Amino acid sequence: MPKETVILAYSGGLDTSCVLKWLLDKQYEVICVLADVGQKEDFTAAEKKALKIGAKKVIVADVKQSFVEDYIWPAVQMGLVYEERYLLGTSLARPCISVALMEVAREYGAKYLAHGATGKGNDQVRFELCAYALKPDLKIIAPWRDVEFCCQFQGRQDLIAYAQQHGIEVSAKPATPWSTDANILHISYESGILEDPNTVAPENLYEMTVDPLTRAPRDPVHLVIQFDRGLPSSVEDLPGGRVYTKPLEMLDFLNKLGGSYGIGRIDIVENRFVGLKSRGVYETPGGTILFAAHQDLEVFALDREVLRTKQVLRDRMADYVYNGFWFSPEAIYARKCIELAEQRVSGKVTVELAPGYCRAIARKAAKDVGALYNEQLVSMDVHGGYVPQDAGGFIAINAVRIREHVRAFGAYDVPTKKN
């Protein structure tokens, strides 16, 4: 009887290497897929490792360009931020990786997908919801939810012992007391010593950014970022005079420059979809710069009520992405609505980078879209187009409900300072 084929989302690390061997012991034929989303990884070494363990095939899927153009750029366009601070670096990578996994599953006729996501985290939800949206007939193998697997592997030491027993290479490099997840948009750090929310993250944890207080340049630097319908279209390095127009190059440049100024660090406690609170430390230098520039241009370009409606949809969409619903009907609907609003968000923003922060300092709308900002109309030195006397009636109408509240319940009791 032929063996069933399993597609394993493989990283080359200890966990998924042990999962690979465990699946082989269960008489599955395993095809490993390593997704290159811009992390610093020795893919050749990981491929050799998986083949040595017994994988039938190892596929390295270079999805960096798709990740930037199809996921990160739309996230910038939509202004996605989860719980007001997290720019969704890990969440956005999961649907991108899932597409690569499903393409391999179709090519090889696999009926099973396996992953190494823990039973307490969000990634199990993200990978599996994406898989069911893209290939509904797929069956999931989640070892960290398997009773037998969890009894066999109580923790990292059990995994190390199992690896040594089966000749699986274990890194000689001491493990950091936290876990990381990296891609071209960000690096996240969690678990280990970071599980105590009162523990300050050590400085040697950070990989993408320098300490803004001690190692960042003192003098600010300026950039001009161009947007076309809400999507980043170019970045001009004013000091260097170079213009970047390719998405991968733009983000790479912003990551390096923003990282050199210590921009994009956050340390937060967030609400996982599975109901737990978790502490995460994140570095997102380039994404932080793009978010700030886009937000400034958006407020400049959009009608006030359109902007407020868009912000409601943005917050819902951020939840959808964080929770794993990128391919859901509600997410597709929200994105289409936001894209319609963003048709007016074209122009350029001048951004200043300084130690630990960035800010927009100038903006200009593209000529072909026009601008709601009317310099003549808003000027205190130019008359016409706006009748100041009309403001009296506007104020009187808005005061009606306040006066009625006072009539019914009495005047507001304003506290006074005691001598």
UniProtKB/Swiss-Prot annotation:
Binding site for L-citrulline: 86, 91, 122, 126, 179, 188, 270, 282
Enzyme class: ligase
Catalyzed reactions: L-citrulline + L-aspartate + ATP = 2-(N(omega)-L-arginino)succinate + AMP + diphosphate + H(+)
Upper lineage: Eukaryota, Metazoa, Ecdysozoa, Arthropoda, Hexapoda
One of the record's GO molecular function terms: ATP binding
Source organism per UniProt: Drosophila melanogaster
Superkingdom field: Eukaryota
Protein name per the record: Argininosuccinate synthase
Protein family per UniProt: Belongs to the argininosuccinate synthase family. Type 1 subfamily.
